[in-house]
Amino acid sequence: MKIAIGCDHIVTDEKMAVSDFLKSKGYEVIDCGTYDHTRTHYPIFGKRVGEAVANGLADLGVCICGTGVGITNAVNKVPGIRSALVRDMTTALYAKEELNANVIGFGGKITGELLMCDIIEAFIKAEYKETEENKKLIAKIAHLESHNANQEDPDFFTEFLEKWDRGEYHD
């Protein structure tokens, strides 16, 4: 399995630790940068990770910046990417199993290296639990990637809100 990984200059050391961990587990790592501590901009590296995954060069991706917010937002702008900012195992597993996330993001100054490694390994091993409902939700999310008139409809998500109101979803 190939894992694309990218970061900004703030968390290069953390990225390298995660990369070393993944290699020790037998995964092929595609290092999308950055490679040192020279000031740079996280969107560049989020985009690179996203493109590697979306183009099939990598199976999954990992993005890390200081808080994780910026790089996760950046990678989510790449069509075909479903990324989640995670800080715990439960969130990572939900993202993969229910939403078929293909990239996870971390705040390298918030989440410790060992915890990141544990979460990433669980994320990689988790499997998407395909259901008709999950497929429909993912299709709705993917539909947002391109502009279309339906997105302007204030009732775009009404079907899912009605199911929530009927108690078909739970926290």
UniProtKB/Swiss-Prot annotation:
Transmembrane segments: none
Record-linked InterPro entries: LacB, RpiB_LacA_LacB, RpiB_LacA_LacB_sf
Enzyme Commission no: 5.3.1.26
Gene3D superfamilies xref list: Sugar-phosphate isomerase, RpiB/LacA/LacB
Pfam family name, one: LacAB_rpiB
GO terms classed as biological process: D-allose catabolic process; galactose catabolic process; lactose catabolic process via tagatose-6-phosphate; pentose-phosphate shunt, non-oxidative branch
Annotated pathway: Carbohydrate metabolism; D-galactose 6-phosphate degradation; D-tagatose 6-phosphate from D-galactose 6-phosphate: step 1/1
Catalytic activity from the UniProt record: aldehydo-D-galactose 6-phosphate = keto-D-tagatose 6-phosphate
Record's keyword annotation contains Isomerase: yes
One GO molecular-function entry: galactose-6-phosphate isomerase activity
SUPFAM superfamilies the record matches: Ribose/Galactose isomerase RpiB/AlsB (SSF89623)
Keyword Isomerase: yes
Keywords: Isomerase, Lactose metabolism
Enzyme class: isomerase
Quaternary structure annotation from Swiss-Prot or TrEMBL: Heteromultimeric protein consisting of LacA and LacB.
Family: Belongs to the LacAB/RpiB family.
HAMAP family, per database record: LacB
Protein name as it appears in the record: Galactose-6-phosphate isomerase subunit LacB
Lineage: Bacteria, Bacillati, Bacillota, Bacilli, Lactobacillales
Protein encoded by which gene: lacB
